[in-house]
Amino acid sequence: MAIILIVNSAGVIFMVNEAIKAAIDSVGSQQKLANACGVKQPSVWAWLHGKKRVSAENAKRIEMATNGSVPAYLIRPDLSALFPNPNKAA
């Protein structure tokens, strides 16, 4: 997953992290994802908009909160040693 562009109802274009958006959609809200990760909602907003990087610990928490529908390797592909992509050849 990557960064995607979204146009809101006012016609404003903004970028969002597709993996974090999928996680929010999966659990129901930014607040619910924040609760699952033990952080405050503004942190989830910052992850969504690329203002803060999701820690390895929270990437795993997101994977667990979404019952694996948003795996940690999609959230932090740069940590392939920690979160290997099972669909990628070694």
Q: What residue spans do the PLM features occupy?
A:
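Short, charged recognition helix plus adjacent turn
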Residues: 1-22, 27, 31, 35, ...
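Recognition helix of helix-turn-helix/homeodomain-like DNA-binding domains
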Residues: 38-53
